[in-house]
Design a protein with these regions (language model features):
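Positively charged, small/polar-rich N-terminal and surface patches that mediate targeting and assembly
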Residues: 1-98
Length: 98
């Protein structure tokens, strides 16, 4: 089992949920508003100087789904370009009680 965390521009929340639905993933958690500092010149603090916010999506996947979802996120990141905040990582996970 794997824990997948995706950090992304909040504008793309519906797109993220849509991608998960396509793979039959209906259990996930979203932290809707996160203030992020991606670099010295790229931040989302929801202010007039640093507009926008990010979100975090967390889900737990069977091993066979994890790499496919990461592949899709890589494609999305390439399509969106460097100016859009997005990163993802997979962590091994022993068990979960939902």
């Amino acid at each position: 089992m794997k824990r997948l965390e995706i950090y992304f521009d909040s504008f793309y929340t519906e797109k993220m949920k849509e991608e998960l639905r396509e793979y039959g993933i209906d259990q996930y958690f979203i932290v809707p508003v996160v203030h992020s500092s991606w670099s010295k010149t790229f931040k989302h603090f929801n202010t007039h100087v640093w507009p926008g916010t990010d979100s975090i999506l967390v889900t737990y996947l069977e091993d066979r789904h994890a790499q496919e979802i990461i592949r899709i996120i890589k494609i999305m990141k390439i399509d969106l370009g460097r100016g859009i905040s997005m990163c993802a990582f997979i962590l091994p996970f022993e068990d979960i009680i939902l």
